[in-house]
Amino acid sequence: MERTFLMIKPDAIQRNLVGEIISRIERKGLKLVGAKLMTVPQALAEEHYSEHTDKPFYGKLISFITSAPVFAMVVEGEDAVDVSRHIIGKTNPSEATPGSIRGDLGLTVGRNVIHGSDSVESAQREINLWFKEEELSSYEAPRDTWLYE
C-alpha cells in the first residue's frame, strides 16, 4: 500500500476543522497510520519547505506554519498520493473544485487548511522528516477487502 504525508495547517486547527478533514480522508478509503498534533519547530518548517526558500512568500509561510499547532499525519491506501491530492484540491481555494477540502474549507492561498505531498518521492521524504518508523502503524482493516481488488 502506498503512503502519503498530510498536514492540517494552523488555520484549520483554529477553525476546528480537524474532524471534518480527517472524516473526508477516511471516507475516501485512506487509512490513518500515523498522526500527531504538534507545534512545528523552526528548523523542521524550514527543511519541509526548503524548495521555496527563494520565493517571496517563504518567510510568511514559515511564520504561519510555526505560529500554532498543526496536525501531521500519514495515510495509507491504493494510490494514496493521487487520491489525497484529488480530495484536497488545488492550492488556491478559489480554483479548487467544490467538494474538495480546499474548495469547501480553504479561504486563500495562504490559508488553504491542508498540505499534501505532491508525489510518491515527496511523500517518502516528508514522512521520514516528520515521523519515526515506530510512530507508524500499518494494519489490516476488515473494510480493506471491500475497498481494494
Swiss-Prot record:
Enzymatic reactions: a 2'-deoxyribonucleoside 5'-diphosphate + ATP = a 2'-deoxyribonucleoside 5'-triphosphate + ADP; a ribonucleoside 5'-diphosphate + ATP = a ribonucleoside 5'-triphosphate + ADP
CDD domains linked: NDPk_I (cd04413)
GO CC annotations on file: cytoplasm
Residues the record marks as active site: H115 (pros-phosphohistidine intermediate)
Keywords: ATP-binding, Cytoplasm, Kinase, Magnesium, Metal-binding, Nucleotide metabolism, Nucleotide-binding, Phosphoprotein, Transferase
Coiled-coil ranges from the UniProt annotation: none
PROSITE patterns tied to this protein: NDPK (PS00469), NDPK_LIKE (PS51374)
NCBIfam families xref list: PRK00668.1
Protein name: Nucleoside diphosphate kinase
Underlying gene: ndk
